[in-house]
Amino acid sequence: FIPNSINIGLDGSFAQWVGEMIPDIKQEILLVTYEDKEKEAITRLSRVGYDNTVGFLKGGFDAWEKSGKDFEVTNRIDGSELETLYKNKKPIIIDVRKKSEFDSEHAIGAINVPLNEINQHLAQFPKDKPFVLHCAGGYRSMIAASILKQRGWQDFTDVRGGFEDISKTSIPKSEYVCPSTLL
């Protein structure tokens, strides 16, 4: 990530998460996108009322990296690597899925901090101990990772593949409850 940026990928629920994470529709936005994705990003922002795009970084993140400027890196592991870590250390696991997703099934001992509430619950993220972050598939947890990096957190790891990958491991999980019964 570029320092002090929020990483909201075009490949997921882009408009929804822009709306959740950038509450001020007049906020100036400078885009860092893949080459030839600038127009798509501007159009998608505009469709949901974000008309204050002030420009984009030509060449995207690659141009930033090639310029020698600082950037943030997030450690990432898959579910099987988390399983090994879990057997040895029982890490703090923070699940950024919606409460209903968490209530449906989660890793035993995980803490739920939904992504859309992250800024109100930063105190739940330890600064003095490493932790593991995940969502359902990896999209939302990377948004969370960019926000945490922006706010000074460094010692955490993201689970690539999210709970979908974790669910294939022997990590203890709560009993599955159909989400429709939780309404």
Where are the regions that the model predicts?
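Rhodanese-like catalytic fold shared by cysteine-dependent sulfurtransferases
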Residues: F1-I92, V96-L183
